[in-house]
Amino acid sequence: MLILFEPGVCQVDVATGRLKGATNRYVKTFRDLAGLYRDESAYQALIATRGDDVAYEVTDYKPSANGGDIIIGVTRMEPGKIGDEYFMTRGHIHARPNRPEMYYGEAGVGVMLLESPHGEIRTIEMRARTMCYVPPFWIHRSVNVGLEPLVMTFSYPADAGQDYDVIAKAGGMRTVLSMTGTVDGPQSITPVIQGDTHRL
């Protein structure tokens, strides 16, 4: 028997970084990101004043969990640094790793940091109207390298799931994004890929 779902509509509110009409919302505070940054003393200093502040939030619309369906949503990330590392998401690979994902930049300046199963590293600059294709099997995380909130829409198969423990089990991704130079605007921000020198 053919089961049909009703068409749906959501609106991306770039100003708030949320999806109007979302069926789900979750947030990560800075306190939730323990162990993510190299500079533990800088992290603890931030926690002392902003521990319960939202580092990033996700709102999404999930019609179903069926394999042929899709999830759409919006991620909003705060700007800033801990030590010399930019604010970033925990990163993940899909629980069904052969599932892809798409990201579309709405506002801000960011980098999509990707790592293949073979340890290959790719970085994709994310700005407004930039679309990023994350292939199957690639671990990925978002990094806000700008001075304003980074807002992106995304879409992936509804049965993909997320595995957030893979990075922790591996001891971190192979690269981090840090900042050099003086920050006085987006054009002065330079992502520096530091290879195996540092691990998260």
Curated annotation (Swiss-Prot):
Alphabetical list of SUPFAM superfamilies matching this protein: RmlC-like cupins (SSF51182)
Domain of life: Bacteria
Subcellular location: Cytoplasm
Gene Ontology cellular-component annotations: cytoplasm
Keyword Manganese: no
Cofactor or coenzyme needed: Fe cation
InterPro entries, per the entry: G6P_isomerase_archaea/bacteria, G6P_isomerase_prok, RmlC-like_jellyroll, RmlC_Cupin_sf
Entry binding sites for Fe cation: 92, 94, 101, 140
Catalytic reaction(s) noted: alpha-D-glucose 6-phosphate = beta-D-fructose 6-phosphate
A Pfam family that the UniProt record links to this protein: GPI
Principal location class: cytoplasm
Cofactor note as given: Binds 1 Fe cation per subunit.
BP-aspect Gene Ontology terms: gluconeogenesis; glycolytic process
Gene Ontology MF annotations: glucose-6-phosphate isomerase activity; iron ion binding
Pathway assigned to this chain's UniProt record: Carbohydrate degradation; glycolysis; D-glyceraldehyde 3-phosphate and glycerone phosphate from D-glucose: step 2/4
Family that this chain belongs to: Belongs to the archaeal-type GPI family.
Subunit relationships: Homodimer.
Database matches in HAMAP family: G6P_isomerase_arch (MF_01410)
Further details from the record: R.meliloti has a classic glucose-6-phosphate isomerase (AC Q92SC4) and two archaeal-type glucose-6-phosphate isomerases.
Name the record gives this protein: Putative glucose-6-phosphate isomerase 2
Provenance organism: Rhizobium meliloti (strain 1021) (Ensifer meliloti)
